[in-house]
């Protein structure tokens, strides 16, 4: 992406907290958090370091997800970095994890703060403020006398330890409290971490008032500080992006606009919000359409996917057969009104609404061209060097966003004729579609990278094959839109920006493939001592192109199998 592309994308983002991702095709290059997404992404117009400059140049798109608070953004950022391992997230990718609280899977569960929870434990968090977590856990132990000792120390005791004398443990190890009573205390701790602040705040408040009445002012002040930590523990914390582990949870939020709708899905695995996706669907004509959208979306989406354990919805659908199916599959359906679950649903709704707003590009484009809303647009571009190593790209955008799984590319005849190459590329796509050899849906619009000549070549190919799909072109130099009716200079707006994104992505994808084809024949790596054909292939696979290898640090080179210090130094010197 160049400075202009970054500036345009930043203008499309909300001025809200959230997480952003720089992406190149299916690869996530960088994940970052922001108090203000728009301003943060705008700062990448002029990167401060060479490393970030290279990242921006390699990126093709910027995706985002809004959150309610900066803390939620911080934790979602950490989860996404751990999941995607982006190349340019050096500091955070290797950073330590955030503290968790676990109740162990023991007959008398232990409560403790940890960064590496036991597999079978009940886990809460992560949390960003460790000191506050320590205060809360200490308060829980004093109030409910939950044990904190290791299982090794617990086993075989014949008398209580010092924690019992200090009022920090009820000594289940020696039977000072029976199993049922201890289980009730553990359940109180669970309820607190599930959002019921009162189960801990009320006992602390009573104790504070008693201390103040007895003029034990230091004790009362200490309890006041502890009470404040407890009462603010769930404010803007991590529970929106992480919760009790062990189950898969999907959250669906729906935003309806006219006759179409966006369904945003958030996925939580093992208690952490790790992924989100968005889908456009046709909405029923009735005004109360959210339940109808859900009733249509759920069976279609999950027909070929594994169902979650819990499904959180923004509204309840009215479909008895769907209810019976989900119940038979063991799915717990909830429409939460408060707490962590409600916060997750609100996040899904926010992302659905943002996607609906972002999808205005296809609607604006339909108005400008006088066609039906082009939900699916395919972009085409050709890249070569003086007619050598000619390649073509075919990218796909659905509702204004890249559909990278549907990207295609192919080598073309080595001919220094842009029009002939474009004709071959579009004919290849059209022929496969007409003959039923391309399983991708028929697009609503084709966008050709170029001017009147390239568009004419593409239209010739469409006429030859009988593939009835409208096509337009976008010229690079003056950003002129070329149609069958002539050339137009559109004002900057959602329609033009969408065409620019498709055109730029087709160009990027073509250039990237051209470099790979060129590098597959002969590269500067061939003359580097210690780099044979297999190692060259691994390097190109890891870094994409020779330019990618050239921009890599020695440390990054040494992470490739077969590259030691000497070889990394030789590569660095040669390139």
Swiss-Prot record:
One of its GO terms (biological process) is SOS response. SMART domains: GIYc, HhH1. PROSITE patterns: GIY_YIG (PS50164), UVR (PS50151), UVRC (PS50165). GO terms for molecular function: DNA binding; excinuclease ABC activity. InterPro entries: GIY-YIG_endonuc, GIY-YIG_endonuc_sf, GIY-YIG_UvrC_Cho, Hlx-hairpin-Hlx_DNA-bd_motif, RuvA_2-like, UVR_dom, UVR_dom_sf, UvrABC_protein_C. It holds the Pfam family UvrC_RNaseH. One of its GO terms (cellular component) is excinuclease repair complex. It is found in: Cytoplasm. Residues 198-233 form the UVR domain. Keywords: Cytoplasm, DNA damage, DNA excision, DNA repair, Excision nuclease, SOS response. PANTHER family: UVRABC SYSTEM PROTEIN C (PTHR30562:SF1), UVRC/OXIDOREDUCTASE (PTHR30562). The UvrABC repair system catalyzes the recognition and processing of DNA lesions. UvrC both incises the 5' and 3' sides of the lesion. The N-terminal half is responsible for the 3' incision and the C-terminal half is responsible for the 5' incision. Interacts with UvrB in an incision complex. This is UvrABC system protein C. It comes from Natronomonas pharaonis (strain ATCC 35678 / DSM 2160 / CIP 103997 / JCM 8858 / NBRC 14720 / NCIMB 2260 / Gabara) (Halobacterium pharaonis).
């Amino acid at each position: 992406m160049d400075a202009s592309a970054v500036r345009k994308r930043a203008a499309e983002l909300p001025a809200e907290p959230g997480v952003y991702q720089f992406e190149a095709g299916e690869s996530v290059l960088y994940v970052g958090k922001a108090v203000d997404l728009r301003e943060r992404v705008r700062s990448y117009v002029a990167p401060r370091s060479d490393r970030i400059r290279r990242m921006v140049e390699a990126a093709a798109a910027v995706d985002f997800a809004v959150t309610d608070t900066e803390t939620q953004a911080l934790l979602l950022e950490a989860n996404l970095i751990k999941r995607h391992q982006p190349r340019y997230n050096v500091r955070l990718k290797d950073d330590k994890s955030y503290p968790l609280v676990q109740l162990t899977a023991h007959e008398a569960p232990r409560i403790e703060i940890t960064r590496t929870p036991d597999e079978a434990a009940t886990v809460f968090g992560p949390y960003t403020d460790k000191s506050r977590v320590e205060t809360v856990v200490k308060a829980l132990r004093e109030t409910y006398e939950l044990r904190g000792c290791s299982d090794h120390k617990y086993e075989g005791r014949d008398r209580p330890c010092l924690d019992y004398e200090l009022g920090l443990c009820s000594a289940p190890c020696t039977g000072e409290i029976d199993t049922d009573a201890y289980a009730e205390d553990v359940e109180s701790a669970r309820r607190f971490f599930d959002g019921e602040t009162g189960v801990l705040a009320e006992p602390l408040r009573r104790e504070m008032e008693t201390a103040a009445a007895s003029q034990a002012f230091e004790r009362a002040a200490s309890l006041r500080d502890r009470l404040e930590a407890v009462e603010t523990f769930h404010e803007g914390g991590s529970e929106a992006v992480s919760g009790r582990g062990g189950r898969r949870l999907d959250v669906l939020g729906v935003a309806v606009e006219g006759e179409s709708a966006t369904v945003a899905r958030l996925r939580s695995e093992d208690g952490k919000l790790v992924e989100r996706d968005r889908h456009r669907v046709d909405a029923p004509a009735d005004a109360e359409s959210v339940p109808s959208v859900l009733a249509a979306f759920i069976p279609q989406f999950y027909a070929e996917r594994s169902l979650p354990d819990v499904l959180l919805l923004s509204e309840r659908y009215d479909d008895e057969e769907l209810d019976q199916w989900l119940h038979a599959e063991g799915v717990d359906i909830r429409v939460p009104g408060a707490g962590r679950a409600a916060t997750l649903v609100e996040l899904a709704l926010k992302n659905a609404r943002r996607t609906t707003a972002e999808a205005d590009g296809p609607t604006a484009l339909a108005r400008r061209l006088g066609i039906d809303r082009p939900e699916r647009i395919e972009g085409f571009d050709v890249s070569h060097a003086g007619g050598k190593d000619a390649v073509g790209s075919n990218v796909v955008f659905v509702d204004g966003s890249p559909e990278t799984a549907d990207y295609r590319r192919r080598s073309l005849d080595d001919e220094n004729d842009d029009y002939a190459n474009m004709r071959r590329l579009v004919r290849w796509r059209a022929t496969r579609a007409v003959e039923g050899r391309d399983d991708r849906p028929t697009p609503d619009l084709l966008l050709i990278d170029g001017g009147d000549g390239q568009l004419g070549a593409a239209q010739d190919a469409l006429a030859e094959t009988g593939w009835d799909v409208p096509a337009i072109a976008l010229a690079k130099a003056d950003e002129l839109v070329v149609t069958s009716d002539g050339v137009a200079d559109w004002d900057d707006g959602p329609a033009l920006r969408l065409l620019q994104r498709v055109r730029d992505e087709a160009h990027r994808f073509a250039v990237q493939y051209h470099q790979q084809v060129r590098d597959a024949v002969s590269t500067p790596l061939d003359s580097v001592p210690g780099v044979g054909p297999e190692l060259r292939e691994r390097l190109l696979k890891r870094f994409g192109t020779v330019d990618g290898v050239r921009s890599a640090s020695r440390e990054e080179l040494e992470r490739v199998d077969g590259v030691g210090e000497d070889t990394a130094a030789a590569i660095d010197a040669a390139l």
